[in-house]
């Protein structure tokens, strides 16, 4: 296990005490809000640090008691009984503190752009893409997040060939970022008379929603084209050109949006373009740290098959962490916290292992 950064822990405690004192001194409303934000950010780790210091002090007292020949038998027996429990508590607190002190992903607190595209499997793949979108939509509803569809191309038999949406709320990206990759489904299509199991797939991409401050797009770097917009099946064709296609000339990225309002379409398309460019920057930075990427959950490659949904067996398998659960019906209703938590725990464990390697 990696060693605890004692100096950093002391600095956090010192800063926490300073914030408490300044908040008690009655600062202005603006200053108080900033202090309260930093206080709430530091409080979880400082409370663990203080619990760790208390437990290590207790352990030191027990060690001194056991080393003292003058300690009577009853006290020695009690100390030997308590020692393993306190050692276990110290070890658990060490790991909790290390996790809390891991470098934060700057994008974790952001909202996200969710993109789902039907892959191999024709109509069944489009239906599965629709099922995945509803799964994430229900998960978001349970978290109090807001989902807004930016663009959608419906499948001929239902579902979606492609759907792009924003998922807005605090910490959305931190919970959904491990969903990127190929999701494979095995089930009997409703149109399959022989009862044969078909395999199809959909690709999910989760991007942190970028703000103007994150990425600068120069007007001379984009080309905006307007087109006629149509509804599902070609119906409700607008009489004006409202669909917008934006091409980012330096990268060749193309984004379209086809709602009724041209102004809204341009804003939505720019929102997606900004997030894709921001994601490209993050991917580039990650590839420069390629030596570390072996320690992350999967490779982050969106062509990587990450998960299989087997409907006949009610089984879900996440191939990155060898997780298998048999409650697929509940998963499809949006109950994916168990999977997300397992992926996050695996990621944190790998980061701790990497930290330990660097210290050795």
Curated annotation (Swiss-Prot):
Gene3D superfamilies per the UniProt record, alphabetical: 3.30.160.20, 3.30.70.1660, 6.10.140.1950
Molecular function, one GO term: translation release factor activity, codon specific
Keywords, in A-Z order: Cytoplasm, Methylation, Protein biosynthesis
Pfam families from the UniProt entry: PCRF (PF03462), RF-1 (PF00472)
Modified residues (N5-methylglutamine): 235
Major localization listed first in the record, in broad terms: cytoplasm
rRNA-binding found in the keyword field: no
Comp. bias intervals (Basic and acidic residues): 281-307
Any single Gene Ontology cellular-component annotation: cytoplasm
Localisation: Cytoplasm
Family annotation (InterPro entries): PCRF, Pep_chain_release_fac_I, Pep_chain_release_fac_I_sf, Prokaryotic/Mito_RF, RF-1
Region Disordered: start-end pairs: 281-310
Domain of life, source organism: Bacteria
Entry keyword Transmembrane helix: no
Function: Peptide chain release factor 1 directs the termination of translation in response to the peptide chain termination codons UAG and UAA.
Family: Belongs to the prokaryotic/mitochondrial release factor family.
Xref: HAMAP family: Rel_fac_1
Protein name (Swiss-Prot/TrEMBL): Peptide chain release factor 1
């Amino acid at each position: 296990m990696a060693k605890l950064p004692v100096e950093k822990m002391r600095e956090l405690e010192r800063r926490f005490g300073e914030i408490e004192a300044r908040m008690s001194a009655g600062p202005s409303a603006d200053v108080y809000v900033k202090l309260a934000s930093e206080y709430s950010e530091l409080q979880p780790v400082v409370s663990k640090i203080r619990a760790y210091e208390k437990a290590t002090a207790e352990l030191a007292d027990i060690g001194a008691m056991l080393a003292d020949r003058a300690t009577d038998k009853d006290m020695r027996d009690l100390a030997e009984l308590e020692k393993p429990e306190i050692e276990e508590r110290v070890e658990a607190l060490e790991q909790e503190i290390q996790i809390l002190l891991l470098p934060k992903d700057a994008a974790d607190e952001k909202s996200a752009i969710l993109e789902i595209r039907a892959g191999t499997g024709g109509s069944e793949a489009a239906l599965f893409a629709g099922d995945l979108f509803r799964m994430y939509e229900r998960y978001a509803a349970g978290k109090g997040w807001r989902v807004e569809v930016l663009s959608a191309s419906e499948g001929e038999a239902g579902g979606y060939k492609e759907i792009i949406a924003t998922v807005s709320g605090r910490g959305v990206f931190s919970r959904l970022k491990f969903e990127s990759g190929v999701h494979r489904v095995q089930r009997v299509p409703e149109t399959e008379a022989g009862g044969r199991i078909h395999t199809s797939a959909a690709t999910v991409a989760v991007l942190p929603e970028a703000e103007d401050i994150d990425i600068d797009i120069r007007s001379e770097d984009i080309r905006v084209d307007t087109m006629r917009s149509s509804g599902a099946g070609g119906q409700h064709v607008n009489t004006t050109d409202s669909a917008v296609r934006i091409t980012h000339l330096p990268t060749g990225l193309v984004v379209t949006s086809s709602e009724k309002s041209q102004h809204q379409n341009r804003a939505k398309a720019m929102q997606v373009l900004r997030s894709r460019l921001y994601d490209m920057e993050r991917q580039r930075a990650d590839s420069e740290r390629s030596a570390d990427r072996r320690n992350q959950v999967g490779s982050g490659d969106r062509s990587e098959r990450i998960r299989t949904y087997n409907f006949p067996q009610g089984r879900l398998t996440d191939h990155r962490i060898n997780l298998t659960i048999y409650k697929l019906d509940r998963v499809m209703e949006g109950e994916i916290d168990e999977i997300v938590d397992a992926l996050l725990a695996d990621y944190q464990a790998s980061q701790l292992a990497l930290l330990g390697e660097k210290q050795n």
